[in-house]
Swiss-Prot record:
Family indicated by similarity: Belongs to the formate--tetrahydrofolate ligase family.
GO terms (BP aspect): tetrahydrofolate interconversion
Binding of ATP, residues: T54, P55, P56, G57, E58, G59, K60, T61
EC number: 6.3.4.3
Pfam families on file: FTHFS
Gene giving rise to this polypeptide: fhs
Entry's Gene Ontology molecular function annotations: ATP binding; formate-tetrahydrofolate ligase activity
Record lineage: Bacteria, Pseudomonadati, Myxococcota, Myxococcia, Myxococcales
SUPFAM superfamilies associated with the record: P-loop containing nucleoside triphosphate hydrolases
Protein name: Formate--tetrahydrofolate ligase
Length: 551
């Protein structure tokens, strides 16, 4: 495989050489100036989502890349607009986040590791603010922060459970003021969310300045701008705000930018990357993390609400193994033919299709085909979709790249062409003027299928504090398990009759939403018993292998 020069990849989109800023040989940034050169041109936006996955994932990124490849084979100027991988999953459970097989982003190892340094810049900006916070505690100026009421948390782009709760400032008075602190993984940090949602440098600085870092001794809120942090943070992030340009395995363009997790953050690639794609491409293929209940709901209710973007339709990725998993098949047998488990799993798929319809969007079912899939079970799935007015496309992009993705590309083009006369208009699940409790209930009942929502006493206190800070009118970002529609990862299929319990609510004033935490969700993951890091090999020529599953 020979990778194309980045100026050639950019030229395919219509980007001029001066707007493609090389970051090494096969990575590049796209100048923000390029956005202003296309007037009001707008391509067609396609949202790729999925049903609730099995732990290894169902190949949503692979299918997004495959769709972009298939559209390119059909003569369309298509671009994938995807999230940057985090080192946490890369070395944790899932391995790399660049797709797989013949439908991958390249250079995969570079993208999965340091890429253009965006996540390091985000981590540095986050921890610069932490240093300024502790400096204010130490000196009592420029504002007298109460050491017992610091809200800002440190960040690291790694799964490390030992850093969830730490004590800092030990070693005597000259070394600091002892206090409890916490680390979040960078992909779950508010700085990551801010970068992903920012519309430019001025907006980035304003959002960073609004971040609430703690309270004074008399209970007044303190923001990042009160310790003069925002401009210095922007200085660290100014290059990270520019979208990254990479390429598919077949040489097509891909905009890979920002990487908030979808189970503990809002789960979407950057607004700037999406806008850049829409300005230059015919079709922009973007994904939202995990199932439709998480990333896609947040894409529509948070990212689109704030930016004014709206997709033309949804591609819902399914696998036969995941449907059987939700139909009760044991993990060891999901790859085997099992019509009964497959049909039972259709109830789970139907709930996701109902959620897509709740937003007023058309959908295409995309089956990520595995070698063991049988024709009879694929036909069973096609019949299920057809009975509900949804076309089903079987995609073999993993094995055959763009050639194996033409059926999917054709179905998506047919869906998009059908919306040209009357494009779908924004339809949100709730009005931001509703109470936080009503907003959470709207999501839980409509998308998760919950009967009721409960707030713990601690969560109710959090909401009272958020109201005092003026944040009650913000959208809600749900933090929930990705393995189930409910807040219990063991409840597979289509759970009914359950109550969603919110145990904590955090205000992300800079990002512009409140985070409602449910279940056992943690904002700093831990490594599994057998982390992916243990299978990585660096060869004598510098090649890195073992980052991807099955590699």
């Amino acid at each position: 495989m020979t990778l194309r020069a980045m100026t050639d990849v950019g030229a395919e989109l219509g980007l001029s050489p001066e707007d493609v800023l090389p970051w090494g040989t096969h990575r590049a940034k796209v100048s923000l100036d390029a956005l202003g050169k296309r007037g009001g041109r707008q391509g067609r936006l396609v949202l790729v989502s999925a049903i609730n996955p099995t732990p290894p994932g169902e190949g949503k990124t692979t299918m997004s890349v495959a769709l972009a490849m298939g559209l390119r084979k059909r003569g369309r100027r298509a671009v994938a607009a995807l999230r940057e991988p985090s080192l946490g999953p890369v070395f944790g459970v899932k391995g790399g986040g660049t797709g797989g097989g013949q439908a991958s982003l390249e250079p995969a190892a570079d993208i999965n590791l340091h890429f253009t340094g965006d996540l390091h810049a985000i981590t540095s900006a986050n921890n610069l603010l932490s240093a300024l916070v502790d400096n204010a505690v130490f000196y009592g100026q420029p504002v007298a922060l109460d050491a017992t009421r610091v809200r800002w948390r440190r960040a690291l782009d790694m799964n490390d459970r030992f850093l969830r709760n730490v004590i800092v400032g030990l070693g005597g008075k000259a070394q600091g003021v002892p206090r409890e602190d916490h680390f979040d993984i960078t992909a779950a940090s508010e700085v990551m969310a801010i970068l992903a949602l920012a519309e430019g440098l001025k907006d980035l600085e304003a959002r960073l300045g609004r971040v609430i870092i703690g309270h004074t001794r008399d209970g007044q809120p303190v923001r990042a701008r009160d310790v003069d942090a925002a401009a210095s943070m922007v200085a660290l992030l100014k290059d990270a705000l520019m979208p990254n340009l990479a390429q598919t395995r077949e040489g097509g363009p891909a905009l890979v930018h920002a990487g908030p997790f979808a189970n503990i953050a809002h789960g979407c690639s950057s607004v700037m990357g999406t806008r850049m794609g829409l300005a230059y491409a015919d079709e922009v293929i973007t994904e939202a993390g995990f199932g439709f209940d998480l990333g896609a709901e947040k894409f529509l209710d948070i990212k689109c609400r704030g930016s004014g973007l709206w997709p033309r339709g949804v591609v819902l990725v399914v696998t036969l193994r995941a449907l059987k998993h939700h139909g009760g098949a044991s993990p060891a047998r999901v790859a085997e033919p099992d019509r009964e488990a497959l049909v039972r799993g259709f109830a789970h798929l139907e709930k996701h299709l109902e959620s897509v319809a709740a937003f007023g969007l058309p959908a295409v079912l995309c089956v990520n085909r595995f070698p063991q899939d049988t024709e009879s079970e694929l036909e069973e799935l096609r019949a299920f979709g057809k009975a509900r007015g949804v076309e089903t496309a079987v995609c073999d992009g993993f094995s055959r790249g763009g050639d194996g993705s033409l059926e999917l590309a054709d179905c998506v083009l047919e869906m998009l062409d059908g919306t040209d006369a009357a494009p779908p208009q924004p339809r949100f699940l709730y009005d931001v003027a509703q109470t936080p409790e009503e907003k959470v209930a709207a999501i839980a009942r409509t998308v998760y299928g919950a009967d009721d929502v409960a707030f713990t006493a601690s969560a109710k206190k959090d909401l009272d504090a958020i109201r005092e800070l003026g944040g009650a009118g913000l959208p809600v970002c749900m933090a929930k398990t990705h393995l189930s529609l409910s807040d219990d990862p063991t409840k597979l299929g289509r759970p009914r009759g359950f109550t969603l319990t919110v145990r904590e609510v955090r205000l992300s004033a800079g990002a512009g939403f409140m985070v409602a935490l449910t279940g056992e969700i943690l904002t700093m993951p831990g490594l599994p018993r057998e982390p992916a890091a243990r299978r990585v090999t660096v060869h004598d020529d510098g090649r890195v292998t073992g980052l991807m599953q099955g590699e």
